Amino acid sequence: MLSRAGLTLVEVLVALTLAALVLGTATVSVLGQQRAHARLRAVLDADAQISAAMTVLGEQLGMLNVRQDLMSGEARDSALQFRAPVASAIACAGWAGRTTLAADPAGSVPLLGVASLPRTGDTLWWLGDSAWVGGAITAVTNNPVTCASPLGAMSGELQVTLARPDSIASGTPLRITRQTRYGVYRASDGTWHLGFREWSSKPPGFPSPQPVVGSLIRTGSRRSGFRYFDDTGAELDQGTSGADVTRVARIRFTAHAFVPVHDRGRDSVRTDSIDIVLQHARGP
C-alpha cells in the first residue's frame, strides 16, 4: 500500500498563522509609508502655498509709497488697504477730462508699464507743478492718436476719461492705481484665510475675497496678521483706527498655517513671514 506525504493539521495552522503575521506586518508597513507620504505632501504643499503668498505680497507692497498709497484707517492687524499701481506712462495727447497713454517709441527707454489694463473706478495721477493730482477714471477706450511733446513725436491709443475736466499736457508723467485690499477672513467652514480683493465699479465696492493662503491660526501667540513699524524700527500701535499710515516705514505679515497631518495625534503648524520696506519717493 502506497503512503502519501502530507501536512498535519497543526502544521497547516502554523503555516497559516506565520503567513498572516507576514502579511499583516507588510500591510502595516505599507500603510505607514502611505501616511508618512501624505503627511510630507501636506507639509510641502503648505510650505509652497505660504512661499507663493509671501512672494506676491512682497512684490506688490514693495511698489507702494508711504505718503499716499496706504489708506488712512485701513492699516490693521487683520487687513491692509492700499492703492496698487497698475500702470505708468507719459501723456501723449489730452483734452479736457481725457488723456492718452503714450506708447514707447522703438529703441527708446521704456516708459510705459501696464501690470493690469486700466478700468473704470481706477485713479489716474498726473504730475502737476509741484505735486501729483488724482482723478477717478470713468471710461477706458482705444483711440489711436499722435502728438508732439517735449520728448518728441509720440503716439498712443489707450485713452482714459476722468470725472473732472482737467487738461493734461503731452509729456506729463502718469500713474494709475487701483484700490486693493488684503484681509484675513473667516470662510464658511470656519477656517481663516488671507484673501485678496480689488475695487470694482459694477457694483461699486469690494467683491468677495479670493483666498491667497490658509487655513491660518488667529489665536494665542501664533496669530497670523499684519504689523507696522516706523523709521526707527518701533512697532506702531494700531488702536481702534489702525496704524498711523503717515509713519509706516515697514510692513510685516506673518502666516501661521494649520496643516491637519494627524501625526501621532498632533497636527502641524508652518510659519513664515515677510518684511516690506516702503518707498519714500515724492507721492503719490
Task: Give the ranges of each region predicted by the language model.
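Aliphatic-rich helix starts adjacent to a transmembrane/signal segment
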Residues: 3-62
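Extreme N-terminus of proteins, especially the signal/transit-peptide cleavage junction
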Residues: 2-3, 267
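Short linear sequence signals and composition-biased patches located at protein termini or domain-edge surfaces
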Residues: 45, 90, 176, 186-194, ...
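Exposed loop/turn and edge beta-strand positions of beta-sandwich/beta-sheet ligand-binding modules
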Residues: 12, 76, 247
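Extracytoplasmic beta-strand-rich oligomerization domains located immediately C-terminal to a leader/signal peptide
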Residues: 40-200
